[in-house]
């Protein structure tokens, strides 16, 4: 039985099928994303969504959807599905679905009377193109397929509406057409692998709604332009391939291209293979530069997310070359930042105070997976430069105090991963001595000291160790409270007593200022108050301001973002901490916990982990939104 298969009963029940979504990407940052019944419910959904660099730094929906119609004996059966005003869905093509399977590639099987039609979609890896193969599995009379493309040509953050500026011009190409609605956009080529008839019948389909945007309090309707439709005859056993891309392709190559792309895929036939496939989706190549996107569908390459996620996305999969390729770009961006030069790389938020420390942590994982000697040869100079940059107090918002701790101003702008804002201000103004920033600092000092000592630089190693001694003593004095857990941040006489997961890093890191008994106390409190089946809570239910309900308009969600929701990415560090305390005896717990996460592969964003969980009903609030740090 297929690992990711959904039967007719689930598919025709929109309450079950609409919340389940699929995402496929390529390394240019383009993607295809929709629900498993091909009904778009978000403005970010689309069949072909691509970056258009000459316009802006956003992705753009070119082809929103493709409605198929099966025609026999003059009778038409439309397989499309859109939501309109008043909870009205049309043309209700989901009622013909017999099953949906995405173990290999997303495959939908329709049954219309005596017709069985299989639709398979694949997003091409190395160019901005989606291919859809239709196979007539069974039919008892002459059959025609009609394809009606719904065009948007707009940013994923905007909507399009009927307007006179949209160009209706098109030109015939081999077995298809090319068209472009607005200046600055690339031409969209829509072709089939066999001869067909294109009927030019331009029209706007008005009032299409996106209920997920409505839930968030945003505008939620738009008009989509349909230039006409393609018609092609198909025989029993025959396959027809539809292509949409930004360059022309030879129709004779479409079947071969489809087959080669399928052969290149790793099936999502297990929990591990699902995670592996999802991990690969965050890689982004732009010319010679290699980035890691923070998440889909809207995040760009953010520095903190890059360094936290990079070991899991590469080294955990045995992909050392990929790690080095990304770090080659990241290292250049780091040096530009350290030298005060304008950024020429698309890695955002490099100025955040914990970013360089997370970079050291990422390189520490590289040293563990390869060797310290290899890490020293590759990145030894960079590690020394980062620590020196911080130690010499050259960072604009990272101040090394005499007590050895790093002080950060986070009152006006969010400066850590808990970065939600409302009305231009941090929802959680973490400021002063921040617990994970100083845990990272201690870890970096000890790690780099050991590295340079092994390289023969005893003087620098002794200097860093001396600094670590001061930092470690102050860390315990400042952060550890009478109840055995750690303050989340301390600013003068203001101590944040909230029980948050950021203290777990101090137990998880290779070097910690806490002794074993102190580590166990921290782990016990995190386990008791923050551990859930879906990740660590961002705030204990016993702490003031606890709110696990990530629902409603965006402003309401912003306030709840880090106030009780559970985040899967934190579990990696929790498990590291658990194994440091319980050693081999803790392995069975880790295994059981991971097995409990496997049911997420068939919920919400299929085959992937979500960014966060709403814990009020233990369900996912952001099913499509995937973050690289979750892997």
Task: Indicate where each model-derived feature is located.
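Aromatic (Trp/Tyr) and acidic
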Residues: 2-82, 189-194, 220-221, 418-431, ...
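Aromatic-rich carbohydrate-recognition surfaces in CAZymes
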Residues: 138-139, 160-163, 172, 234-236, ...
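Glycine-rich phosphate/pyrophosphate-binding loop
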Residues: 200, 204-232, 418-427, 431, ...
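Terminal accessory carbohydrate-recognition/targeting modules of carbohydrate-active enzymes
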Residues: 1-267, 271, 297, 304, ...
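Short, solvent-exposed segments of well-ordered alpha helices
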Residues: 224, 228-231, 293-300, 346-350, ...
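Glycine- and aromatic-rich loop/turn segments at beta-sheet edges
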Residues: 280-297, 326, 332-348, 392-426, ...
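Catalytic cores of carbohydrate-active enzymes
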Residues: 273, 391, 398-401, 442-550, ...
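Single conserved hydrophobic/aromatic residue that forms the stacking wall/gate
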Residues: 618-631
């Amino acid at each position: 039985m297929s690992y990711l298969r959904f039967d007719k009963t689930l598919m025709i029940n929109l309450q079950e099928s609409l919340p389940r979504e699929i995402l496929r990407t390529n390394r240019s940052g383009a993607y295809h994303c929709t629900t498993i019944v091909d009904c778009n419910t978000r403005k970010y959904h689309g069949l072909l969504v691509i970056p258009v660099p000459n316009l802006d730094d956003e992705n753009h929906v070119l082809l929103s959807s493709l409605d198929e119609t099966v025609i026999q004996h003059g009778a038409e059966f439309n397989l499309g599905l859109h939501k309109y005003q008043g909870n009205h869905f049309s043309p209700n093509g989901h009622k013909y679905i017999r099953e949906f399977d995405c173990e290999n590639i997303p495959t939908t099987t329709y049954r219309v009377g005596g017709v069985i039609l299989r639709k398979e979609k694949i997003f091409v890896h190395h160019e901005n193109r989606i291919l859809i193969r239709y196979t007539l599995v069974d039919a008892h009379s002459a059959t025609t397929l009609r394809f009606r493309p719904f065009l948007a040509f707009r940013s994923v953050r905007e909507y399009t509406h009927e307007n006179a500026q949209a160009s209706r011009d098109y030109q015939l190409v081999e077995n298809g057409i090319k068209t472009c609605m607005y200046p600055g956009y690339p031409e969209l080529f829509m072709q089939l692998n066999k001869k067909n008839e294109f009927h030019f019948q331009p029209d706007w389909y008005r009032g299409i709604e996106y209920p997920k945007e409505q839930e968030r309090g945003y505008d939620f309707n738009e008009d989509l332009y349909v230039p006409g439709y393609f018609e092609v005859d198909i025989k029993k056993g025959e396959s027809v391939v539809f292509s949409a891309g930004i360059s022309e392709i030879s129709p004779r190559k479409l079947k071969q291209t489809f087959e080669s792309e399928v052969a290149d895929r790793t099936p999502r036939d297990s929990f591990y293979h699902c995670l592996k496939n999802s991990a690969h989706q965050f890689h982004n190549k732009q010319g010679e530069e290699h980035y890691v996107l923070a998440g889909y569908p809207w995040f760009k390459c953010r520095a903190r997310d890059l360094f936290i996620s990079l070991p899991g996305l590469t080294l955990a999969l045995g992909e050392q070359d990929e790690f080095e390729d990304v770090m080659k770009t990241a290292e250049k961006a780091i040096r530009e930042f350290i030298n005060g030069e304008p950024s020429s790389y698309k890695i955002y938020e490099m100025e955040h105070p914990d970013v360089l420390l997370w970079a050291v942590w990422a390189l520490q994982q590289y040293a563990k997976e390869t060797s310290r000697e290899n890490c020293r040869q590759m990145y030894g100079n960079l590690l020394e430069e980062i620590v020196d940059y911080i130690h010499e107090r050259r960072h604009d918002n990272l101040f090394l105090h005499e007590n050895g701790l790093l002080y950060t101003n986070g009152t006006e702008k969010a400066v850590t991963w808990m970065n939600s804002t409302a009305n231009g201000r941090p929802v959680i103004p973490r400021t002063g001595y921040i617990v994970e920033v100083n845990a990272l600092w201690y870890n970096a000092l000890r790690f780099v000291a050991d590295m340079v000592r092994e390289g023969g630089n005893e003087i620098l190693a002794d200097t860093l160790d001396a600094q670590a001694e001061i930092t470690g003593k102050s860390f315990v004095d400042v952060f550890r409270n009478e109840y055995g857990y750690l303050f989340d941040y301390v600013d003068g006489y203001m101590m944040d007593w909230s029980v948050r997961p950021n203290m777990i890093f101090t137990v998880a890191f290779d070097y910690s200022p806490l002794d074993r008994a102190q580590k166990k106390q921290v782990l016990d409190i995190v386990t008791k108050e923050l551990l859930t089946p879906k990740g660590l809570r961002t705030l204990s239910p016993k702490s003031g301001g606890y709110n696990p309900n990530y629902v409603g308009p965006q402003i309401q969600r912003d306030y709840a973002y880090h106030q009780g929701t559970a985040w899967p990415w934190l579990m990696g560090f929790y498990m590291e901490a658990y194994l440091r305390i319980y050693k081999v005896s803790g392995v069975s717990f880790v295994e059981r916990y991971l097995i409990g996460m496997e049911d997420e592969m068939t919920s919400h964003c299929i085959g992937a982990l979500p960014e966060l969980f709403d814990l009020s009903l233990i369900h996912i609030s952001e099913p499509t939104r995937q973050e690289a740090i979750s892997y």
